[in-house]
């Protein structure tokens, strides 16, 4: 399993809240990645970190939600998030999707908020010291410098990919690691939006 960044934890916590809202409001109906981000933004309209999030980077945030649920013996709330094309969870999802969705819909999520805060704090404490957050402008400048000297490696990078790379660099990754993570997410999740 890859290491979570501060960005994964912050956005993952917001996605958790949106998924709980989705589970309650729709009895466990699936929600596409892009719509999930939109729902989370509507619940937290002033959250700048969430505002920068893009569907291509949603995989690690959902893994954070999944890890939280698994650590407390809850149904996998992340199973509600689905790919726009396949209408199914990402290829890394293991389990009986229909049964998991029913379990998510029946579960009482009311008492989980405090546990999420505690889990997020302990996960933040486990983030390696080398993952030092930086501001958006320095991350953008560093990405541009990397992009200019590695154009061939960056040939398939879209505008949405670039935004997630900047998000990851703001969370402390170097440009090469951020690019590798985004390309791996594209391979794993395909067209996530």
Predicted segments with their positions:
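Charged/polar low-complexity intrinsically disordered segments, enriched in acidic residues
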Residues: 131-179
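Active-site-proximal segments of catalytic enzyme domains
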Residues: 18
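Nucleic acid-binding interface residues in structured DNA/RNA-binding domains
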Residues: 1-15, 24-138
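N-terminal intrinsically disordered, low-complexity, charged/polar
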Residues: 1-14, 172-173, 178, 182-193
């Amino acid at each position: 399993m890859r290491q979570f960044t501060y960005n994964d934890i912050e956005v993952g916590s917001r996605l958790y809240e949106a998924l709980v809202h989705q589970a309650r409001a729709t009895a466990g109906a699936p929600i596409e990645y892009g719509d999930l981000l939109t729902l989370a933004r509507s619940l937290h309209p002033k959250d700048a970190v969430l505002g920068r999030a893009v569907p291509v980077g949603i995989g690690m945030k959902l893994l954070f939600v999944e890890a939280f649920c698994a650590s407390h013996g809850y149904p996998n709330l992340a199973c509600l998030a689905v790919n726009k094309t396949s209408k199914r969870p990402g290829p890394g999802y293991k389990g009986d999707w229909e049964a998991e969705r029913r379990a998510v819909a029946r579960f009482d999520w009311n008492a989980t908020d405090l546990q999420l805060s505690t889990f997020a704090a302990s996960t933040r404490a486990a983030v390696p010291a080398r993952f030092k957050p930086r501001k958006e402008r320095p991350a953008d400048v560093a990405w541009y410098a990397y992009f200019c000297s590695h154009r061939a490696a960056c040939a398939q990078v879209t505008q949405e990919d670039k935004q997630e790379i900047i998000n990851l660099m703001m969370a402390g990754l170097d440009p090469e690691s951020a690019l590798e993570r985004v390309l791996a997410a594209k391979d794993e999740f395909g067209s996530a939006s």
